[in-house]
């Protein structure tokens, strides 16, 4: 798939089968950093093999962490109290789950570092995190536009003077980065560290993932709802010995959607009713749209209508603040709804791998949908009968755009996905697995 300029999707009618999900990106990169900061050795299984995890692994090795060879999703990491290499230039691609947490960890440890990424990474805001780290006395310099990467870290005087405040309305990754790095400073300073959230915290389920994983590495965070989080002065990460990564719930959304529009059943394994990921709630969205959703320990299964034969999903008007990544799948499913669909509270889309509101608006219109959008919302009216149009779908160097629009193959238009290799960010084999679930139109 890598290197292909485009992929013409075969017209699809039915979808059925079972998919073993790749490891969660959000969990994988968090666990890699926590294992590096923890005392002892951690064997990680089920690790996602993707661009973003390779970026994190390469950065940890460059910082002097002992990282074993990755084989079949397994890797062993020897933790360090602080990174042995105190001067380095790190290239972190477009991996926000690597860039933000590493920025915080490096700033609070001390040293001299330069962090950069691809051009889009340099358009993704980081100013709120930098402002919070500067409250600890961290020396951080913008090497380009203020508020954005690339960054130079070093030269500060780290201290704890009281609670640190961080804006919560732009990205939950800023709070995640501070939480994960705070035990390093709490232990060294001998002081409790309190992080206070300013504004309305978005994407709260991702903070739940962070807190859950920190606890598995021995650090329990005291909290006052979503307003304040305190890390005790004696907090210390300890490797759990062995850590299994659960499947990616955001990736599950595409396959569960296939079951909802292709009849099904489609079952995903690796996530289930006991998942720590908020995006499993997307299954409830599918149920609200009329799909039959079933859960078990470590699996979710969907059955639904056959949209290629005239079946329709129920239209929706919903707040997707808690599941912004899976919400993109809902936007493409709106092509098959029985009326206009509205996605609200998705402002975080603007600062993801691309401006996802603009990108989704543009590509859905190509297929004949009626689309309106605003700062934090998107409304999609399905194409009228006879109104579908053949389309070359731009993916905007965004893995989720490519995977979402694979669902368009169930409509009556010819669909070409441009740059399908962008799925390598999280799921290099996506289109092969997708094809295995489809039955071509008669």
From Swiss-Prot:
It catalyses: 3-phosphoshikimate + phosphoenolpyruvate = 5-O-(1-carboxyvinyl)-3-phosphoshikimate + phosphate. GO terms for molecular function: 3-phosphoshikimate 1-carboxyvinyltransferase activity. 3-phosphoshikimate binds at residues 25-26, 30, 171-173, 203, 325, 352. It is an enzyme of class 2 (transferase). Phosphoenolpyruvate binds at residues 25, 96, 124, 173, 356, 400, 425. It comes from the Bacteria. One of its GO terms (cellular component) is cytoplasm. SUPFAM superfamilies: EPT/RTPC-like. GO terms for biological process: amino acid biosynthetic process; aromatic amino acid family biosynthetic process; chorismate biosynthetic process. Pathway: Metabolic intermediate biosynthesis; chorismate biosynthesis; chorismate from D-erythrose 4-phosphate and phosphoenolpyruvate: step 6/7. The active site is at 325 (proton acceptor). It is found in: Cytoplasm. Catalyzes the transfer of the enolpyruvyl moiety of phosphoenolpyruvate (PEP) to the 5-hydroxyl of shikimate-3-phosphate (S3P) to produce enolpyruvyl shikimate-3-phosphate and inorganic phosphate. Monomer. This is 3-phosphoshikimate 1-carboxyvinyltransferase. The gene is aroA.
């Amino acid at each position: 798939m890598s290197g292909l300029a485009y992929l013409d999707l075969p017209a699809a009618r039915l979808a059925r089968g079972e998919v073993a999900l790749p490891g969660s990106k959000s969990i994988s990169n968090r666990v890699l950093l926590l294992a590096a900061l923890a005392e002892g050795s951690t064997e990680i299984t089920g690790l996602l093999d993707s661009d973003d995890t390779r970026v994190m692994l390469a950065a940890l090795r460059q910082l002097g962490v002992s990282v074993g060879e990755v084989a079949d999703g397994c890797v062993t990491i020897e933790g360090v109290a602080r990174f042995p290499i105190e001067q380095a230039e790190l290239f972190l691609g477009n991996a926000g789950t690597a860039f933000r947490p590493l920025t915080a960890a490096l700033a609070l440890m001390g040293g001299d570092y330069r962090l950069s990424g691809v051009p889009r990474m340099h358009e993704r805001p980081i100013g709120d995190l930098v402002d919070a780290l500067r409250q600890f006395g961290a020396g951080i310099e913008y090497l380009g536009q203020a508020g954005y990467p690339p960054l130079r870290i070093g030269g500060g005087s780290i201290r704890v003077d009281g609670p640190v405040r961080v804006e919560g309305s732009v990205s939950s990754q800023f709070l995640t980065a501070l939480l994960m790095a705070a035990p390093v400073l709490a232990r060294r300073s001998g002081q409790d560290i309190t992080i206070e959230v300013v504004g309305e915290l978005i994407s709260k389920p991702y903070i739940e993932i962070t807190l859950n994983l920190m606890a598995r590495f021995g650090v329990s965070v005291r909290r006052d709802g979503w307003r304040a989080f305190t890390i005790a002065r004696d907090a210390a990460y300890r490797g759990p010995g062995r850590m299994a990564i659960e499947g990616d719930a955001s990736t599950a959304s595409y396959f569960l959607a296939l079951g909802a529009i292709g009849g099904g059943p489609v079952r995903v394994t690796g996530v289930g009713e006991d998942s720590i990921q908020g995006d499993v709630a997307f299954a409830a969205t599918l149920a609200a749209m009329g799909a039959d959703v079933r859960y078990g320990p470590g699996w979710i299964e969907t059955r639904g209508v056959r949209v290629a034969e005239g079946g329709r999903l129920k239209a929706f008007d919903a707040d997707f603040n808690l599941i912004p990544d899976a919400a993109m799948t809902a936007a493409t499913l709106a092509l098959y709804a029985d009326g206009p669909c509205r996605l609200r509270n998705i402002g975080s889309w603007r600062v993801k791998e691309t401006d996802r509101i603009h990108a989704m608006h543009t590509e859905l219109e190509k297929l004949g949908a009626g689309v309106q959008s605003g700062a934090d919302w998107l409304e999609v009216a399905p194409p009228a009968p006879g109104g579908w149009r053949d389309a070359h779908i731009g993916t905007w160097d965004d893995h989720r755009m490519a995977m979402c629009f694979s669902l368009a193959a169930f409509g009556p238009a010819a669909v070409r996905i441009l740059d399908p290799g962008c799925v390598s960010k999280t799921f290099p084999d996506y289109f092969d697995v997708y094809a295995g679930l489809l039955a071509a139109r008669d």
